[in-house]
Amino acid sequence: MRISISNIAWDINEDEKIRDLLQEFHIGAIDIVPGKYFPKPEETTDNEIYKVKDWWSKNGIEIVGMQALLFKKNEMNIFGTKKSRSMMLEYLKRICHIGNILGAKRIVFGSPKNRDRTGLNDLETENIAIDFFNCLGDIANEENVVICLEPCPAYYGCNFMNTSFETAKIVTKILHPSIKMQLDSGAICVNAEDVFEILSKYSNLIGHIHLSEPNLVPLGDGNTNHNNIFNALAKYLPNSLVSVEMLATQNEPHLTSIRRALLVANKIYNSESLP
């Protein structure tokens, strides 16, 4: 399997050191948080986007995905007003454009605060979501990217698409070629889900895979059963791209925690790449 890691784990002023670490591990892919490089996406020029892409590319590293799309955009809510939905679609249109130029085809939609269905019944929730994500799917299709809906457990305060099964149900009903789901090992652990059951039923819906722990601690520091995740992926989605997702550590240098996480990822998911 091919390993990637999200830059949610480090600060962009550490990019050169991270580049060296990734080269040491023979890792040639990263996911990014777009806001780290482009704090105002609507004002970002194509040249600025190409500059980021080219820097990583010349170092042998491909940007393959994006996450945390709506960080600090709490005024936007799928289940808010029509104006709120319209604002969100316009903003995400720009995010998809950035993804297209970067080559980051896998756009992960997590954003639990931006999918708050409070006050709506199941039917209302479903109808609004299907309509919204079909519109977003059309935007993604125009930009040659895929939106991957992320399960977010109730444990994190989310109240829509909490489980992998709920997410798969929504993706199935949306029925748009540019809307997939994300497989998330941390969510599987929190929800005590059976990854073999998920993949036996829904492997065709998976657009991206995050390797994570509950609370996004460094890989291996939580209780996710990564051997089980690997075995299921090897059976149903061999040769997958799998991306390490962990928060930047507060009590340990980022390079130290990232090195530990990559050792775990490579040992289980890609032993041939160990330095």
Kindly give the residue locations of the regions a language model identified.
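Histidine-acidic metal/acid-base catalytic patches
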Residues: M1-S4, D11-H26, S57, L89, ...
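Active-site acidic/histidine proton-transfer and metal-coordination neighborhood
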Residues: E16, K58, E75-K180, V190
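Short phosphate-binding/catalytic loops that engage adenosine nucleotides
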Residues: I27, I61, V145
